[in-house]
Amino acid sequence: MRAGRCAAALLLLLLSGAGRAIGSEDIVVGCGGFVKSDVEINYSLIEIKLYTKHGTLKYQTDCAPNNGYFMIPLYDKGDFILKIEPPLGWSFEPTNVELRVDGVSDICTKGGDINFLFTGFSVNGKVLSKGQPLGPAGVQVSLRSTGADSKIQSTVTQPGGKFAFFKVLPGDYEILATHPTWALKEASTTVRVTNSNANAAGPLIVAGYNVSGSVRSDGEPMKGVKFLLFSSLVNKEDVLGCNVSPVSGFQPPDESLVYLCYAVSKEDGSFSFYSLPSGGYTVVPFYRGERITFDVAPSRLDFTVEHDSLRIEPVFHVMGFSVTGRVLNGPDGEGVPEAVVTLNNQIKVKTKADGSFRLENITTGTYTIHAQKEHLYFEMVTIKIAPNTPQLADLIATGFSICGQIAIVRSPDTIKQMSKYRVVLSSQDKDKALLTVDSDAHGSFCFKAKPGAYKVQVVVPEAETRAGLMLKPQVFPLTVTNRPVMDVAFVQFLASVSGKVSCLDTCGDLLVTLQSLSRQGEKRSLQLSGKVNSMTFTFDKVLPGRYKISIMHEDWCWRNKSLEVEVLEDDVSAVEFRQTGYMLRCALSHAITLEFHQDGNGPENVGIYNLSRGVNRFCLSKPGVYKVTPRSCHRFEQAFYTYDTSSPSILTLTAIRHHVLGTIITDKMMDVTVTIKSSIDSEPALVLGPLKSAQELRREQQLAEIETRRQEREKNGKEEGEEGRARPPGQEMVDELQGPFSYDFSYWARSGEKITVTPSSKELLFYPPSMEATVSGESCPGKLIEIHGKAGLFLEGQIHPELEGVEIVISEKGASSPLITVFTDDKGAYSVGPLHSDLEYTVNSQKEGYVLTAVEGTVGDFKAYALAGVSFEIKAEDDQPLPGVLLSLSGGVFRSNLLTQDNGILTFSNLSPGQYYFKPMMKEFRFEPSSQMIEVQEGQNLRITITGFRTAYSCYGTVSSLNGEPEQGVAVEAVGQKDCSIYGEDTVTDEEGKFRLRGLLPGCMYHVQLKAEGNDHIERALPHHRVIEVGNNDVDDVNIIVFRQINQFDLSGNVITSSEYLSTLWVKLYKSESLDNPIQTVSLGQSLFFHFPPLLRDGENYVVLLDTTLPRSQYDYVLPQVSFTAVGYHKHITLVFSPTRKLPEQDIAQGSYIALPLTLLLLLAGYNHDKLIPLLLQLTSRLQGVRALGQAASDSSGPEDMKRQTKKQKTRRT
């Protein structure tokens, strides 16, 4: 059975194990799951292994052969890696799973599955070089299903040509090889994958590899050099893409070489051989000019093609005459006579009548050639002249002159005529300017242009354009072939504008204006007058530009009250103003349709306007009084309004209610009632219904129409005759009613009103049960409500054979809790309903002692099977019951993992008939049988005996502190010694400090010690390790004492100073990043020693500062400071404080400095007493103020001064 079809919940009991009960160590956590595959695989070849995160194997097991189920017991918490180890080439996802088993939230403790999905086998093959045992790297190889176009996988070959595809499921496949440059002889093969890895049916073959090189002469590439290929090992038939014909004039240098083919160098000097098989070759260059054969170096080159493309090195070089040419006026054109040809700006020759010229004494090299001729233009050409180029390429004229004239007849009055204009040359099919020139003072201009179709335009300045200056033509098209164009001309243009006015009645007096849109202030008017309904007008001598033509009469409606015309290159005519009616203005609160007709007139005067919100203007075709009726989804203050064209005013319409539409759609025609509740208290609840569906109303209309026609036939029966009266009335039939059925309703709501619509029916369920809608009133609400009603759903089913009391659970699909629970009757039947028909439901059944499965092809029917049972008796080799054994039983969709109790017996009941696989597991024991497949029949009870044999033993002990307190969470390990050095076990102490190391092999010596990692809180252990020898019994009382890390740092120090200063001293402790706030302060009192309270051993940086209350006005001193890091356990520091008392003469000295400038000022006062006396008094006052401030600052020095010193001095670290 395929494990991919297995899906059931894992039943895992966490019970205490056998032997000594020492707490959580004996708790068994089972980590299990499935190896799943959608194809048949041999599960017995797959192993599941459990490793520690350091790579130590903890446990391994195989899979159930029937469904791939596996189970691994865990006796310790910690970090593990669960790996699947299948045969080489088999692929699974994932390949390993990292586990962090904490006994609470991990996947094993929660009973979750850990599944490995088989993704396929491997397919291996080779790509070989033709005739070789190896092949190339870098060939693209793809795998696709036979007959399919899309590839499944692709890879590239490795050195030697090997390739492999992984994750390939059974089937028939094609393997195809491709390479962008190499030719493939065998590009495809096949492979069939069944139930194991597969090899390609045959190798893929590369026919050959491309080989290339290059040839130059004086650093320039050479074309036309032949390269002949020879080989004594490769057959000519195996070489592809090469000219095999013999080369005329070539003599082979070595008769032992076999000629294969040749290649010729291209324009860039490169040559290549398309496909050469692996092997040794010789290439010989051969180059003959028009009359001479040149030497090429090297003259011969041997090379070997292996399994890759090859670039031949070194580059071949051609080692060591008059030339002629022509100058033409175009491709295949005529020769240009008297043209000057210059070579490297030094040698000059003139062309003959046919345009030909000759250059003498030219050596191989690169030259610059240029031709010159009036009104013809040539590009400078750089060419390589070599013996193989005796005839130079033609020098072809690339451009010709285009010349013309601009003629201004009269300049506009508002501007001054310019002396020159800009002229633009552009391509006829593009507007982008190619060339731009300025005309001279006489209006002449010239361009230089290549052959082609062009257009010439004169750029008139914007000021002159606004003034009305225009040249004609605007665009001068021309074609340059092989000679200059000299007849381009532009002249000024003036125009006239004319039109007519059409009135509904007599026109009377009208005013028509012509105003320039491009020139401010230019405006002309024409006064029209007449008793006719049509008049004409004309404006003459109009300068080019944009104009606005307007007609003045505000109370009339015009088709166009004003028109914009643009005078370009022609006169403007056919301008028409036509009166359309009389103006009506209307102010609306909402966009509506307005229907009106004229009182006293027939229906032909009815008009309809679609108007927008705000003030609208529209025209009435005739004068008089009109009745105006609004038609919209809004209800207004009046049902209709009147308007008189003889008394024009703004007609105002304001909406007070808005039409809300709704629909109830049902799949069945039923009674439907709608209740509408308003958020406005003054509006009562409105009950509509029972409603009639649109289908019912349409049917009633059809019946009414049939009845009307029947009555008409009876009325006219006498005229129709007896035959007509005898026509049966049943010939006309109404349409049958078919769902879905629509029940429409409406409601007139106020602006901002919120309504709640609730439908009701006896047999329908509505979705949603009710709807709310808020009417803004800004626009037509339209259909705001749409509710669907559906008939209730009834679920019915039957148990086969008939079985009473089966629990039927109905749940909504995806819901976590059941919806309805019922039991079958004595006939085994049940019925549930009505339910919401638009929801999906799941129907489950259960009954103790039975397996119930859904009957295929039915919904709600189940088939019942009586369950079977299996009992396992697990004993030790001394026939005593063996508790604590984890027994895994799996089969089909069932699996269970249980621990044996003190009696060693496990019973599995309620099993479905089928095959089951069991496996007993317990560390330190092996079992017979170790695993087995069993067949369980329906209703059968089996009894199976299993014997366990002890193969390893345990070590028990405790970890405690020096005072005997247990240490929890300490990692302990047993490390094998000597011949057992590859073995090891580890565990973690429980809350009582106890540990159990399982799986210690008899005859081995172990060191029991603390693990290096995971014990950061432990400083050391006593002893460092305990030595044990394992015999045929468990090892007890292996106890270890541990010492925790001390996290305290002691700080002490002393001060060297005179005892008279001790009472003024304080020692302050700061963190180095915060020198403004001390964290601790101690006073020395009468002692030279100090001690701070213990600090944390946190590795932080600290600063110790000495502070004093001695006034700086009387003492000079430096406050010492020491910085340190809280590393280790203790720090002692020494501070030196040596103050000195200031002398009184210092004050006199300060006064002498002040007296000197005072004396000088007094001497100057005799000369400038009127100016210096006020200045002297001011200076004296300021100096005294400065002195007083200095004295005050000296007296108040202390901690602040200490901080300044701290910033100045470098910190002394100890």
From Swiss-Prot:
Keyword Transmembrane helix recorded = yes
Highest taxon, organism lineage = Eukaryota
What's the gene?
Answer: Nomo1
Q: Which cell locations does it reside in?
A: Endoplasmic reticulum membrane
Q: Please state what the protein is called.
A: BOS complex subunit NOMO1
Signal peptide segment: 1-23
Q: Which residues carry this modification: Phosphoserine?
A: 1196-1197
Q: From the UniProt entry, list the residue stretches annotated as the region Disordered.
A: 708-733, 1190-1214
Q: How does it assemble?
A: Component of the back of Sec61 (BOS) complex, composed of NCLN/Nicalin, NOMO (NOMO1, NOMO2 or NOMO3) and TMEM147. The BOS complex is part of the multi-pass translocon (MPT) complex, composed of three subcomplexes, the GEL complex (composed of RAB5IF/OPTI and TMCO1), the BOS complex (composed of NCLN/Nicalin, NOMO and TMEM147) and the PAT complex (composed of WDR83OS/Asterix and CCDC47). The MPT complex associates with the SEC61 complex.
Q: Which parts of the chain does the record assign to the membrane side Extracellular?
A: 24-1150
GO MF annotation terms: carbohydrate binding; ribosome binding
Question: In its UniProt record, which GO terms are filed under biological process?
Answer: multi-pass transmembrane protein insertion into ER membrane
Function, as annotated, reads: Component of the multi-pass translocon (MPT) complex that mediates insertion of multi-pass membrane proteins into the lipid bilayer of membranes. The MPT complex takes over after the SEC61 complex: following membrane insertion of the first few transmembrane segments of proteins by the SEC61 complex, the MPT complex occludes the lateral gate of the SEC61 complex to promote insertion of subsequent transmembrane regions.
Instruction: Give residue ranges on the Cytoplasmic side.
Output: 1168-1214
> What sections of the protein cross the membrane?
1151-1167
Tell me the PANTHER family matching this sequence: BOS COMPLEX SUBUNIT NOMO1-RELATED, CARBOXYPEPTIDASE REGULATORY REGION-CONTAINING
Q: What is its main location?
A: endoplasmic reticulum
Instruction: From the UniProt record, list the coiled-coil ranges.
Output: 692-720
